Structures are given as C-alpha cells and as structure tokens.
C-alpha cells in the first residue's frame, strides 16, 4: 500500500462524512430558507442563545476598536446589561460565551448574525459526526463508508433538540472525544488527550462536561467489567482517568472556580421541581411512549427525551439481541445502560445538576445505536434465511405493539413505510445475487435516504411542523430592534448611570443592545435576586430563572435607578406614576433618585416580612431593609402605605369559594367592582394563589400544570379593548421552572385613570387554591413624603467594575447603591476597607459616619484569583513534570548506550 492509499484509508470516514453531510444540510436548510425562517427557536433560542451571540459581537467590536485606538481592552468582570447586573463569565458560560466556535462564527458574519447562528449550529453538527468517526475508528477498524454512515446517524439522532438549544451540542460532540481519550489512556497509557478535552470542556461549557463525566464513568465501569485484566490493573486505570480529569479541571480553574461559585449560589440548585412522584419510575405512559418513539420520526416527547432514529438503526438493535459471544457483550451492556439512564428519574435529576429530571442526555443512547450500526451493518448483508425471518418477525411484532399503544400516525406512517421498505431491501440484499455484491453500498444509501426522509417528516408542515417553532428573520430582527429600545440606546452611552424599564416583555433585548434594563432570562439567577422577587410576589417572575421587568411599579423603579420608561404602544395607559412624556413611546422619571442615595433609617427584614408584599415594597423607601441591625443606624418599624378597597365579585365561567377558584372554561374570569380610588397606584394581590396539578400520573407532565393569568383595570362605559394587560404564569411544582412564591401581585395602573373594576382572566380550565384576594391603592402624597427623606448622591460614578465618588453625611447614614449584591464587590471608605451590607433584598449598602467621605468599590469575579492561581500552578507543574521526564529519558538512553558499548 502506497502513502496515498494509506492516507485515504486513514481519513476516509472523516472525508466521506463531511461530503455526505452536505445533503441533509441542504435539505434541512431549504425548509428554513424557503420560509425566511431563522435558526433561532422562539423561546430559548430567541431570548438566550441569540442574545448571547449578540453579546459576543459587542465584545468583538470593543476589542477591534481598542486595537485600532491603541488601547488595551479589558473584559469587564461585571456587566449591567445582564439583568440589573451580573458576571458575564459565569452567567453566560452555559451559553457558549467562551466557545471558540461561537467567536469564529460571529467574526465571519458580524453584520449578519442570523448567518453566524446558523453556521455555529452546523459546525457543531459536523463536529458531532467527526467525533463519532474518531471514536469508532479507534475502537474498531472497519470500512470508512460504514463509519461515515454511523457518524451521520449519530449527528441526526438528536437533531430536533439541538436546533432548539445549540449549547446542548457540546455534550454530543465532546462525549465521543472523551470516550476516545479514555480508550487512548487505557491502551497507550497517555493521559494528555483526556486532560486536554477536560480543559476544553470546562472552558466552553462546564454544565455539559459535568454530565459527560458521569456518563463517561459509567462507560469506564462497563469497559473494565468486560476487559480481561486484574483488579490491580483496573484500579490503576481508574487512578489514571481521575488524575487526567483532575489535571484538566485544574488547568481550567480560571473558568471552573468562578462558575462553581455561581452555581452554588444559584437559586435553582437543590430546588425540587419537575417529576417528583418517584425517584426510580416515571409514569407507565412514559415507557409506552419511549417504546413507540424508538420507531418514529419527530421523536421529542416527555421529560425532554429525544429519539430521532432511523429504521436501519432499529433493525440493528434487533440484530444485536440475536448476537452471541463476548465480543457483543460490551455493546449490549452499553446500549441497555444508556437506555436505562433515560428510564430512571433519579438519573435525569443527577445528570441535570440535581434539578428537575430531564433526558437531555439521550446522545449516549444515540452513540450506542450508531456503534451497533457500524458493527452490524456488514452482517445485515450476510444474513441466513432463518435470521431474516426472525428479524422480520421482530419488526412485525414491534409495529403491532407500537400501534396498539398509540401508533405512529403522527408522522403519516412514514417511519412504518420506510421500516417495511428497509426489511424488503434486506431480503433483496441477502437473496438476490444482483444486490449481494453491493450490499454495504445499498444499505448506506438506505441510511442517507432515511435521514433525509426523517428531516422532511420533522420539518413538514403536514406532520412534524418543526419550523413553526422558530422565528422568522424579520420577526427576529424586529424583536431586537424594537423602537422603544432604539430611543434610549443613544442615551445609554452617557456617563450617567441609569436603567430603562419597558412595557413589552422582550427578554434580554437590553443585553443585546447594550442598554441597562430590568429584564433577566439566564439559567443562573443569584439567590438574592430570586428572594427579592418572591418576597414581593412579583407577577413578572415568570419562571425561576426569568424576570420580565419590574411591572412598572414606581417604588421598585426608583430603587433600581430607572430613569426612563419605554413602550412601542401609542397608548399612554400603564405608564408608571411620576413619569412624564418626552416623545412618543419614551417617558422620563420626574423624581429620579439616581443610582445612589442616603437612608437615615433601617428596617429589619423580619419586620418587613410581617407586612403584605405591597406594603413591603413601599417600606423599602422608609428605611433600608437589611437582615441584621446596622450599628449606629436607627431601626424603625415600617408603616403601611397601602389601603385595601372593598369590592364585589362577578364571575364568568368560574366557581369561587373562600379558598378555591375553579375555572371551568378557557378565559373564565373574575371581575372585582370597587369604588374609584382617588390617588396613587392601583394593585391586585392574590394571596397564597397556587395552581393544583391536574393529573400526577400522566406522561404529559413535561412541564407540569400551568396557566397564564391576565389582569387589567377597567372603567364603566369604556368598551374599547386595551392591549395593556398584566400577566402572570402560575405553575405547579411539577413544572421544570417552578418558582415557589406565596401568591402574586399585579400593578394595574394609575388611580387617576379612573378604574372602577379589575378583570382577572384565566387562560384555561384549572383548579386554584388561595387565601385571600385584595385590591389596594397607595397614597401618592405619602410616597412623596418618603422619598423626600432620601438624599440623592450625584457625585457617584459607576463603571463596569468600579464605583467611586464622594458623599457627605449630616449624621450616621447608609449609602444605598442600585447595584445587585455580590461577594465579588469590595469597598473602601476614605481608603479603609469596610463591609458591604445586602440591602432591600438584592442591592448593596455601606454604613457611613457624619462628614465627607470618599467611596471606592471594586468588583472581582468570586474565586477568579484562586482559579487563575490554580491554572498557573497546574501549568507550571506540567512543565516541571515534562522537563523531569525528558531528563530521565535522556539519562536512560545514555545508560543503555554505555551498556551496549
């Protein structure tokens, strides 16, 4: 064999896979392009993944501008466009913030981000198949054609889910590489590949490396169980694997340590949500559906389980059952184990970071099926008639059982037809001499055809209608270039620090436009931030990681340093009290306190919690609310600022009792009639409102029972339909994103708008329990009295990582800063270190003595220094180890030479 032939044999599978991938890419992209549809899914893709790419683009612009101007660009550790302020290194890590693929994709199309997003996805799909080829070629030397087909099967097994969430592809394309590096370690005793892939995994997306570590350990146990070696050898292999993981983890300490800190301080950790009936068994209907989806296109169903297989893969699984001998033992164990992981809720919960049980980890099963395909597809061309009959019977039995359970009609029986055609092809390949000589080629063509048919079924409007889950290019651009944000974007470049509240719930639009706003939708939400929202029972807390702004409540807007209120609607209804029109869609705060002001009094949080949540929010303007007493600061009892309004209830398709709300039909409603309030803001409080789980036994509990509730103020004789409605999403604990709160509050508008009733509309039939329902108004005069006692500090300058300025106090006072609390902040007053107090639930405060003071605050990512030090020490250790190793080798070589002489 000459050099050219050996090169071709070595890289044949990689090249063939890359060429074959063009076909499904063209087919799938044609569905998107023909309808001018982007690759951004209309929930997470729109609000998170696409926003993260926009954030990366802004960083690239700053880097380029910094180089052009001859100044070094320093990535800020703290960013005020992530919610009200967060650390980008930790908040965006799960969204591929440090992934080179994302940065390259954005750099190639900086002005066409939809193309960057598309390129990023297809690169990761491409890498998934290439990673499979790498692993498969090392495990088993087979024909490159079969390996390439296996790579194609593996890439598209989970394609339906990965287009929704591009960051989940990390697990898919890195998992085979991790297994390959483990095999290299076992056979060649080389730890470097595993350490390197560990480092890269932690750097780009720690979340999926965590799950891959667990899955790879399961794989290692299976390999050692089937490997003929001594106990001592197995222990040594385990030590080497752990050592490689440790070195890789320590190398990535600069990213790993801060993200671990953020994860531990994340509200969602340990939160029991999702399916909780049993740690070991899902509802029986889930297992029935799992069985059906093994032979079905459009395979996403309960608990985020995705199986988009092809008929030939299913037939290979049936053939695996028929195989005998130790050589198939490991493959059988791996396939069964990967399937069992999806069948046990506890496994889903552990792999998901001890959060809700989910099956995002179906790619190990996909890998097992693809490996079975590569190992057995050749045998499918050499079947005896008896084996053909048995396989045909197994297929027939499967189809009968699947149809008796629920059938495969949702894909137009396309999978069934293709499965039967595949069986006919197998008969032809094994019995007709004309086809026998080209069996592998024919089955490869059947594989490609199956992938194409699967894509067509999933994307077809008649069956899967997958495309409807994605945003059109025009709608995507409109979402991020909303006029209301455009009006304030230029203002955001001013040196003055302020935030913007918008009426529309375009989540993370502020982040993408580099405007400081109030919405937040990222997986990691600090505990303090969440506690703030649940203490106030905000209706805008839609999920345990999603906040749709501050509901236009004047007190909360003042505390958050909101200077402008924007809306795309020409209707002035719902504009917060105290905001004056500047131009259409833009309103300014007439009593803007600024980002820093002084309190004379403090309130203990335990005292504030004794009040209802509406009085609680007003109390934060009477005194700074803290967990403990502040030395030398007067502690007061908060006064009630809310007045309850008596009302009469009218129901529509709703049964109402003292403790229960039973909604009978869609858009059932409660109408609360009251006397017109004369001043202030109008609020609704549904105390203790909880939605009851509809049916705990059903497989449909993907997200648990949930329903939207809309509220709006009304006035008699006004027949127009206003688009100004306040919304909340009530979820049962079975929902993945359940946020426990003891009720919900809504701001309905200014009392001067003349409302005399509140209409509460329930989106769909459901059962609710509650403690009480109240309509409240606050007193504008009392509000102005409270804020007049607060002293704005105009000489405070807020940068990305620093706060500095001068403050003059007439007595012992507390400096309040509208910056989210974090242990990463440190403070100095007149050059001396001082403590920072968590204030009003989520912000920061510094106690001050009488006189003039110079204030300095600096932010450093928590645990970042320890991470940097660990990474540097690990690099030094590796270099020292390599130097010693090289010296030992040279001495050993010299010694051998002397012996020979």
Residue ranges, per PLM feature:
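A cross-kingdom signal targeting lumenal/periplasmic-facing segments of multi-pass membrane
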Residues: 101-106, 516-664, 673-675, 681, ...
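Membrane-embedded helix bundles of polyisoprenyl
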Residues: 21, 103, 122-139, 144-227, ...
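Active-site-proximal, structured, solvent-exposed surfaces of multi-pass membrane proteins
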Residues: 2-9, 53, 640-901
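Membrane-interface coil-to-helix junctions
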Residues: 21-132, 152-172, 263-268, 276-303, ...
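Transmembrane alpha-helical segments
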Residues: 128-136, 174-186, 214-222, 314-319, ...
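Periplasmic/ER-lumenal interhelical loops and adjacent helix-loop junctions
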Residues: 47, 55-56, 237-241, 245-330, ...
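Extracytoplasmic/lumenal acceptor-recognition loop(s) of multi-pass membrane glycoenzymes
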Residues: 82-85, 91-94, 452-473, 489-559, ...
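Contiguous transmembrane helix-bundle modules in multi-pass membrane proteins
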Residues: 189, 208, 330-346, 350-480, ...
């Amino acid at each position: 064999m000459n050099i050219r032939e050996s090169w071709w044999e070595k890289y044949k599978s990689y090249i063939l896979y890359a060429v074959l991938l063009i076909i499904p890419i063209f087919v799938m992209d044609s569905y998107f392009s023909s309808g001018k549809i982007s690759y951004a899914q209309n929930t997470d893709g729109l609000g998170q993944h696409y926003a993260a790419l926009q954030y990366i683009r802004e960083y690239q612009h700053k880097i380029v501008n910094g180089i052009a101007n001859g100044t070094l660009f320093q990535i800020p550790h703290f960013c005020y466009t992530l919610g009200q302020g967060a650390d980008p290194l930790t908040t965006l890590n799960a969204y591929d913030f440090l992934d080179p693929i994302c940065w390259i994709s954005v750099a190639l199309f900086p002005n066409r981000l939809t193309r960057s997003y598309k390129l990023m996805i297809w690169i990761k799909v491409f890498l998934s198949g290439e990673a499979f080829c790498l692993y498969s070629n090392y495990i088993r030397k087979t024909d490159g054609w079969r390996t390439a087909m296996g790579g194609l099967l593996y890439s598209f097994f989970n394609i339906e889910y990965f287009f929704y969430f591009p960051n989940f592809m990390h697990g898919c394309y890195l998992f085979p590489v991790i297994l390959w590096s483990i095999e290299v370690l076992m056979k060649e005793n080389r730890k470097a590949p595993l350490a390197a892939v560990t480092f890269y995994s932690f750097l780009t997306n720690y979340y999926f490396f965590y799950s891959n570590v667990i899955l790879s350990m399961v794989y290692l146990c299976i390999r050692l169980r089937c490997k003929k070696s001594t106990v001592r050898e197995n222990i040594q292999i385990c030590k080497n694997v752990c050592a490689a993981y440790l070195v890789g983890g320590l190398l990535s300490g600069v990213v790993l340590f801060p993200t671990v800190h953020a994860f531990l301080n994340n509200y969602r950790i340990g939160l029991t949500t999702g399916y909780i009936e049993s740690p070991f068994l899902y509802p029986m209907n889930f297992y029935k559906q799992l069985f059906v989806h093994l032979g079905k296109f459009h395979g996403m169903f309960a608990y985020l389980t995705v199986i988009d297989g092809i008929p030939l893969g299913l037939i290979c699984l049936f053939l695996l059952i028929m195989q005998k001998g130790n050589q198939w033992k490991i493959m059988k164990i791996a396939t069964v184990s990967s399937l069992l992981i999806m069948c046990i809720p506890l496994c889903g919960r552990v792999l998901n970071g001890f959060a809700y049980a989910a099956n995002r980890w179906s790619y190990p099963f996909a890998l097992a099926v693809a490996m079975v395909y590569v190992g057995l597809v050749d045998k499918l061309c050499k079947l005896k008639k008896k084996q053909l009959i048995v396989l045909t019977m197994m297929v027939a039995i499967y189809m009968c059982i699947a149809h008796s359970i629920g059938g495969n009609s949702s894909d137009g029986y396309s999978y069934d037809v293709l499965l039967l055609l595949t069986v006919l092809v197998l008969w032809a390949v094994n019995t007709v001499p004309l086809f026998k000589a080209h069996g592998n080629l024919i089955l490869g063509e059947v594989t490609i055809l199956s992938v194409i048919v699967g894509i067509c079924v999933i994307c077809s409007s008649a069956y899967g209608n997958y495309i409807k889950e994605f945003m059109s290019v025009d709608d995507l651009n409109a979402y991020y270039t909303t006029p209301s944000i455009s009006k304030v974007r230029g203002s955001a470049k001013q040196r003055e620090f302020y935030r913007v509240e918008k009426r529309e719930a375009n989540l993370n639009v502020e982040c993408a436009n580099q405007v400081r706003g109030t919405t937040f939708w990222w997986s990691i939400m600090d505990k303090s931030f969440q506690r703030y929202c649940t203490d106030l029972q905000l209706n805008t807390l839609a999920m345990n990681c999603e906040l749709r702004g501050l509901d236009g409540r004047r007190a909360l807007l003042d505390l958050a340093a909101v200077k402008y209120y924007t809306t795309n609607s020409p209707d002035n209804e719902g504009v917060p009290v105290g905001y004056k029109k500047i131009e259409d869609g833009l309103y300014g705060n007439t009593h803007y306190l600024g980002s820093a002001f002084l309190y004379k009094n403090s309130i203990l949080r335990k005292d504030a919690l004794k009040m209802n949540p509406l009085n609680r929010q007003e109390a934060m303007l009477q005194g700074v609310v803290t967990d403990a007493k502040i030395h030398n600061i007067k502690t007061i009892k908060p006064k009630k600022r809310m007045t309850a309004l008596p009302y009469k209830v009218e129901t529509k398709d709703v049964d109402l009792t003292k403790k229960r709300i039973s909604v009978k039909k869609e858009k059932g409603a409660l109408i609360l009639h009251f006397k017109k309030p004369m001043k202030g803001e109008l609020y609704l409080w549904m105390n203790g409102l909880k939605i009851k789980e509809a049916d705990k036994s059903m497989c449909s509990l993907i997200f648990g029972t949930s329903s939207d509730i809309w509220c709006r103020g009304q006035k008699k004789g006004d027949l127009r339909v206003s688009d100004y409605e306040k919304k909340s999403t009530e979820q049962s604990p079975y929902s993945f994103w359940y946020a426990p709160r003891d009720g919900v509050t809504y701001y309905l508008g200014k009392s001067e708008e003349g409302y005399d009733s509140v209409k509460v509309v329930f989106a769909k039939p459901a059962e609710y329990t509650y403690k009480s329902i109240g309509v409240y108004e606050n007193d504008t005069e009392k509000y102005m009295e409270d804020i007049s006692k607060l002293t704005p500090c105009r000489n405070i300058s807020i940068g990305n990582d620093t706060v500095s300025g001068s403050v003059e106090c007439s007595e012992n006072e507390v400096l309040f800063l509208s910056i989210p609390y974090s242990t990463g902040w440190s403070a100095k007053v007149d050059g001396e270190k001082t403590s920072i107090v968590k204030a009003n639930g989520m912000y920061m405060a510094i106690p001050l003595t009488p006189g003039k003071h110079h204030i300095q605050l600096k932010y450093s990512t928590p645990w970042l220094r320890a991470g940097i030090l660990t990474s540097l020490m690990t690099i030094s250790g590796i270099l020292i180890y390599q130097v010693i190793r090289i010296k030992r080798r040279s001495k050993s070589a010299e010694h051998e030479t002397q012996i020979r002489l």
